[in-house]
From Swiss-Prot:
NCBIfam families membership: NhaA
Lineage, uppermost ranks: Bacteria, Bacillati, Actinomycetota, Actinomycetes, Pseudonocardiales
Segments passing through the bilayer: 22-42, 67-87, 103-123, 134-154, 163-183, 187-207, 213-233, 276-296, 298-318, 336-356, 371-391
Gene Ontology MF: a single term: sodium:proton antiporter activity
Name of the protein: Na(+)/H(+) antiporter NhaA 2
A GO biological-process term: regulation of pH
Organism in which the protein naturally occurs: Saccharopolyspora erythraea (strain ATCC 11635 / DSM 40517 / JCM 4748 / NBRC 13426 / NCIMB 8594 / NRRL 2338)
Topology term for the membrane: Multi-pass membrane protein
Chief localisation class: membrane
Function: Na(+)/H(+) antiporter that extrudes sodium in exchange for external protons.
Pfam families: Na_H_antiport_1
Length: 404
């Protein structure tokens, strides 16, 4: 029924998955499947599968995790490894190494994280300390999801818009990683954390020597992940730490190792890790008054307002202020309506938002379910609003430039 793919077919699928657009499309499909499954006659099986513990004997080493936790702690480590490679490449050899070019997207990213956090906090100020733990949920943008929407509606939009979104998202990812590491680590096992430096150092030595021995690198990566997990720091940070050791610059005319590893692992991240995370985390029941309960929760209201309103005000406001009060100028191909559409697009928060929701309120909790619903609703609303603005701008650019 499912014949084995040829080498050419395998390569073709991998190339497709290397594009953010395809990754976003697969992510959307996985999220929809999760929602359908969680609200189908087989909804009970969804809870059974996500709550299943594959290795009950792993309790002594803290690895008696259920499927949902393996998805958020394990699979997302691959996603953060790819993000880390991209971050280092951008800072060493990309746009972010030029302070003048990087200034506007960096300020826009910082403001686009700060304003949603303020909006969320203002709404939940009197909802109790527990509610305030979710302040970081609306701060991050899901770049794969956002680029998938942009690709569908923006065939004639200037390339500068996509480049700005990509650069902003890189900074956004870096700050989101810092937020998770600093604010969502409750206690640290110093011995385990220091022990993680040993496999990291060995991994760094091999990659600096350009030795891509998978039989050595993979066990070192797994050891790093296990020790970081045991330390109390979220295990996905292990992926970032390992990525930062990989050299970026070329040698003897060959692409840098960071680029080559990103080329290998991006399809795994986009086609397997992130979609499975979405499948096992995004399923939330909409039956029996669940929607009404979520809409009455200030946490859910704060998440929606932060993503949709906070991102728009933060990104657009910072970009406008930079153009108004500094020497920075808007690209000649762009208008402020283009920037407004892009700012709305950054309100699509998914992967990191769901992860932070789990860290803040616990996976499977009632409030955690409200957060999942809010993230999905806000992302859908932001995508719709951005589509309205950018479709109009796409038509305008098409008239100016012609159909080609």
């Amino acid at each position: 029924m499912f014949p084995r793919l040829s080498q050419l077919e395998t390569r073709t699928i991998a190339e497709i998955l290397r594009t953010e657009t395809a990754g976003g499309a697969v992510l959307i499909v996985a999220a929809v499947l999760a929602m359908v499954w969680a609200n189908s006659p087989w909804a009970q099986s969804y809870g059974t599968v996500t709550g299943f513990v594959p290795w009950p004997g792993g309790e002594p080493v803290g690895l008696d995790l259920n499927i949902r936790h393996w998805a958020s702690d394990g699979l997302l480590a691959v996603f953060f490894f790819v993000v880390g490679l991209e971050l280092k490449r951008e800072f060493v050899a990309g746009d972010l190494r030029n302070p003048q070019r990087a200034a506007v997207p960096i300020v826009a990213a910082v403001s686009g994280m700060a304003v949603p956090a303020v909006v969320y906090t203002a709404i939940n100020l009197h909802a109790g300390a527990d509610a305030l733990r979710g302040w970081a949920i609306p701060v991050a943008t899901d770049i794969a999801f956002a680029l998938a929407v942009l690709a569908v509606i923006g065939s004639h939009l200037p390339s500068a818009l996509r480049a700005f979104l990509l650069t902003l998202a890189v900074v956004d990812d870096l700050l989101a990683i810092a937020v998770i590491a600093v604010f969502y680590t409750e206690s640290v096992n110093v011995v385990a954390l220091l022990s993680a430096l040993l496999p990291i150092a060995a991994f760094a030595l091999l990659v600096q020597l350009r030795k891509t021995w998978w039989w050595a690198l993979l066990p070192l990566a797994l050891a790093t992940w296990g020790l970081v997990h045991a330390s109390g720091v979220h295990a996905t940070i292990a992926g970032v730490l390992l990525a930062f050791t990989v050299p970026v610059l070329q040698r003897r005319g060959r692409p840098g190792l960071a680029e080559r590893l990103e080329h290998v692992w991006r399809p795994v991240s986009a086609g397997v890790a992130v979609p499975l995370f979405a499948l096992f985390v995004a399923g939330v029941s909409l039956r029996g008054g669940a929607v009404a309960a979520a809409l009455a929760d200030p946490v859910a209201i704060g998440v929606v307002a932060g993503l949709v309103l906070g991102k728009l005000v933060g990104v657009f406001g910072a970009t406008f202020a930079m153009a108004k009060f500094t020497r920075a100028t808007l690209d000649e191909d762009l208008s402020w309506l283009d920037v407004a559409g892009l700012a709305l697009l950054t309100g699509i928060g998914f992967t990191v938002a769901l992860l932070v929701g789990d860290l803040a309120f616990g996976s499977g909790s009632e409030r955690g379910e409200h957060v999942t619903f809010a993230v999905l609703a806000a992302s859908f609303l932001a995508a719709c609003l951005a589509s309205v603005v950018l479709c109009a701008r796409n038509a305008a650019h098409k008239r100016v430039r012609g159909p080609h």
